[in-house]
């Protein structure tokens, strides 16, 4: 049986440009979720579409080091670096959770040069909802 002829420069093999479209975003929302185990920073546009995100785990911190303030600072810096290149100048910050990385992430956001219109704490508070887990005995 004859071998099929390979076409050089066929459409399948070539890639035209990048899939991610780069758009200018003047204003956005920075969501910081700080738990005791990890800190996740998500940057969205005003409509809520995710532009960039980072967490302490993706920055290379593993285990208990993910919950540290330094890990949160690094995660916030990584998430914001991408959106500053896309032209973001103003942002709102929404912080959720009781973790140690709350203040460190906010400090890193302030240092990035983005003007903050407001900082809001959106930590969910139960009105006597579910029973909390038992206290630790160490």
From Swiss-Prot:
Domain of life according to the entry: Eukaryota
Pfam families to which the protein is assigned, alphabetical: Ribosomal_S11
Keyword Transmembrane helix among UniProt keywords: no
Disordered, as annotated region: 1-23
InterPro entries membership: Ribosomal_uS11, Ribosomal_uS11_bac-type, Ribosomal_uS11_CS, Ribosomal_uS11_sf
GO CC, one annotated term: ribosome
UniProt keywords, alphabetically: Chloroplast, Plastid, Ribonucleoprotein, Ribosomal protein, RNA-binding, rRNA-binding
Location in or out of the cell: Plastid, Chloroplast
Annotated GO biological process: translation
Cysteines joined through disulfide linkages: none
Molecular function terms, GO-annotated: rRNA binding; structural constituent of ribosome
Gene3D superfamilies: Ribosomal protein S11
Subunit (UniProt): Part of the 30S ribosomal subunit.
Family classification: Belongs to the universal ribosomal protein uS11 family.
This protein's name: Small ribosomal subunit protein uS11c
